[in-house]
Amino acid sequence: MLMKRFTTDHLTTFAAVIEHGTFDAAAEALRVSPSAISQRIKVMEQLAGKVLLRRTNPVTPTQAGQSVLRIARQSEFLQLELERELVGEGGFQTVSIALNADSLATWFLEAVRMLAHEDEIFCDLRREGEFHSSALLRSGELMAAITSRPGKIPGCSVDYLGVARYWCVAAPEYMSRYLPGFSSTTTREELNRAPVVEYDRKDFVQEAARVLIEEDMKLPPSLEPEQSPTIYIPSSPDYARAVYEGVAWGLLPQAQCSEHFATNTLVKLSTKPVEFPLYWQHWNINSPVLETVSRRVAEAAKTGLLSS
């Protein structure tokens, strides 16, 4: 049996309740009575046959409500897109995108520039962890995200972008101070004492880098997790600067270290790179704006990432 469809008023009301946190605040924003808000939500839950909102403070969507919220936000986006097309010149639209800091620092900004200059589409960029990005895509708060996993998020399409290549590197003065005679005579104890820089406490890529370094040093696998002095720098440019200035060793995107290899101002701690595939997850809706954004992102990735 097919359920009856929600109206535009239903979807607008639902999104407003989530955005403002309470029925009263949503009523004020929409200029209707709180009882009208309550009645619309009640009708929606009757149509769905499920509870869509948790009556907490602030109000939050249930799992079923997350799907409704995504549709509500997509509906609002498509209405704005229609207005933009009808208005013609002078209209613009904003697209919310989550990505990692390294992508923004090395290749994604070209897509942002082209969208703003050529298409009058403006990006609301957010640095989010991949798990949180997935939740925000499901709820419709984000329209797209750069991810390192290909698993399709409900309501979204996924496109392969390319491979981001990183190198384990350090400055020569850092090597002289902490890892003299590196590779030939360096011990695990010396490596454990050598400071490392990480982006934040959710940054686990250094573990993969450490494995490659120990393989090059021909060290036997460690039975215990290794812990080095760690400096946390949640900024891609400042993270790179810390490596350049010999503060710590770190994992840098190829774009941030290629010139330094040519001038011998960075040393590789491993002969093998660390590589991550990147994917473009975006709402699965028929939208000229999102199609344009996807095209610009793919163009930027073509020059900024490896093809395989």
Task: Please describe what each predicted stretch is.
Residues 47-48, 68-90, 95-96:
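Alpha-helical linker/hinge and terminal dimerization helices associated
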Residues 217-268:
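Hydrophobic hinge/microswitch elements
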Residues 247, 269-308:
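A late-sequence structural motif
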Residues 45-63:
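A short LG(V/I)-centered, amphipathic sequence patch enriched
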